[in-house]
Amino acid sequence: MNSSSSHRNILVTSALPYANGPIHLGHVLEGIQTDIWVRFQKAIGNECYFFCADDTHGTPVMLAARKEGITPEQLIERVGQEHYRDLTSFGIEYDHYDSTHSKANQEISKDIYLKLKSKGHISRRSIEQSYCETDKMFLPDRFIKGTCPNCKSKDQYGDNCEVCGATYSPKDLIDSHCSLCGTSPVVKNSDHIFFKLGDFHKKDEKSTSLETINPSHLKTDFDLQSWIETSGVVSESEGVKKKLKEWFDAGLQDWDISRDGPYFGFEIPDETNKYFYVWLDAPIGYMASSKNFFEKNFPNEPNKFDSFWKNKNSEIVHFIGKDILYFHTLFWPAMLEGSDYRAPSKVHVHGFIGVNGEKMSKSRGTFIKAETFVKYLDPEHLRFYLASKLGPGMDDIDLSFEDFINKVNSDLVGNLINSVSRVSTTILDALDRTLGVVSKEGLALIEEILYQTVKFGPGEDSIQNIIKYAYDQRNYAKVLREITRLGDRVNRYVNDNAPWKLIKENPEKAREVVTVTLNASRFLAIYLYPVVPKISEQIYKLLNLQDSPSFKDLDKNRILENIKVLPYEMISKRVDEKAIKAMLEENKQSEHSKKVETSENPVPEERLEISIDDLSKVELRVGQIVEAGPVDGADKLVNVKVDLGELGIKNVFAGIKVAYQPENLKGLKVVVVANLKPRKMKFGISEAMLLASGEGESLSLFIPHKDAKPGDRLK
């Protein structure tokens, strides 16, 4: 059971946040889960590196930059800094955080592609592709929405279903439409490049490709299904194995790895206006991030990169959400093995996070951004709470704020921190803040914390080994149950000996109790270090220890005696329910403000049915923006002049600046509510309303057909 019996060399990654939105609690969950595991591996002496990067390519990034009037490079630079700031504010400590838009990533992507091509795993064929006549572009999968052809869930993307996990072609989507303008796309032919995934599954040895770029097809010895079943890469999760079996039984399809320009990404070698699909170079970002780190930090070890990515004696471990299982357990390992790299050792899959028993909701204020959480609450508290919920499977996690308050205040602050604080203030002051020696009785307590035998499954083992094993298996809930139980034992020792009484009657006996308590608490801080590193380091600082907590110090021969202890500083406060309410209220107000500024007449959340007579009262007309400018004192408003043909030019204040820069609006045709009662605002009179859909940076104005004329009425 002892996970530290032999030295391990481990490269760890968490999934890459996409560069067109803020970090929220879903990202934070994965980052914390990964960081705890990495900190544990380092604490027991393993060589372990933690890499991540921003996922920066694709049409969404390109269009988001266009709306802001900046280049994609400028956008991803800013967002990357924001992502890194938000993730590290939760104590997530990367060895290197990179961007997929890097020279190293481009070079490795090219290398992998050309090797796959030379071995016959790449094919070309003409495909029917969705094209938006309004926006004059081929539509990427994520800009097509409709009903899933597999489970019939509505509002799903063009490449995969977030409900059932199925992947498919955009043309298979039912009732598809362009998510930019809402019109139904037309179909055009375009040559695309495919990765023949079926080459890596014996059941699918015959390729379905119509034309092979390299006709000398070479077989591969790597079979995905055998690898999944025998390598243990996902052995701990029956749910994962069941889902993979479904995909194998259905047969593995060739994977389209190209996109037509315009597209923000890497051009495919020897092709014209063809770019790598973002999902090809995104996971390669793991490799590029590690390559950049190794070249900078190990200049005298040129084979450091290969010692992980080409050496199966090392470990490559991915932490991902269950929504990207297909890519990481099928496409990714096949790409690696097919290009002379090695497949991952483990793919650890976690579930989603909800808040108060429901999915995160913007309207209820529970779609919580990382930036907002740290403004009101202690990130260490979230680390502790999520760890108490995390097991080795991929079950979803619920952040119940009532439970959050109780668990943090009771188990962390009221138990594990309390054992330190209750003996470190006035009692230690009266003892010149100096520890004594550990008594025989005290040594028995410390040995209980370090070496006691505990039942585990059908057998038993030492408490240290059980905690280490649970950490290694990502069973953090088990870890915290054991540590909390030990914390109860330490607090019981303090209660039984009452040093606040002894300080008056027998100061040296009080010193002995304090010495035992702080030594016991120090060992608990070591156990806790991967979960709450800041709190553990504060306890170390109190004890005047310069090093970070390390599992090698879990030894009774490392007891601290006759040392001076620093003045006590608050380690952590209890969670205040008022802070949670304030955070949720800010979220709700922020969302409400967006809706108000987007529409002069916000639609209520409850669906309201109207009659045909009501609808006929609304006069929708085509307008053309002839002027657009900012509004002083209103960061989210744009002042536009709209030409409505015979109705003349109307003045409109529109809450669209989050998605559109004024200088990009002139000449744009829009849909206008032309007979809206003029509204007096502090900036002036707003005489109409522009129609738009979506929220935040995804907000899009409704665009009429190019031949429509200003003043035309929509019917």
UniProtKB/Swiss-Prot annotation:
Enzyme's top EC category: ligase
Motif ('HIGH' region): 17-27
Free-text remark on how the cofactor is bound: Binds 1 zinc ion per subunit.
Chief location of this protein within or outside the cell: cytoplasm
One Pfam match: tRNA_bind
Catalyzed reactions per annotation: tRNA(Met) + L-methionine + ATP = L-methionyl-tRNA(Met) + AMP + diphosphate
Molecular function in Gene Ontology: ATP binding; metal ion binding; methionine-tRNA ligase activity; tRNA binding
Gene3D superfamilies in alphabetical order: HUPs (3.40.50.620), Isoleucyl-tRNA Synthetase, Domain 1 (1.10.730.10), Methionyl-tRNA synthetase, Zn-domain (2.20.28.20), Nucleic acid-binding proteins (2.40.50.140)
Function: Is required not only for elongation of protein synthesis but also for the initiation of all mRNA translation through initiator tRNA(fMet) aminoacylation.
Assigned protein family: Belongs to the class-I aminoacyl-tRNA synthetase family. MetG type 1 subfamily.
Protein name: Methionine--tRNA ligase
Organism of provenance: Leptospira interrogans serogroup Icterohaemorrhagiae serovar Lai (strain 56601)
Lineage, broadest ranks: Bacteria, Pseudomonadati, Spirochaetota, Spirochaetia, Leptospirales
Protein's gene: metG
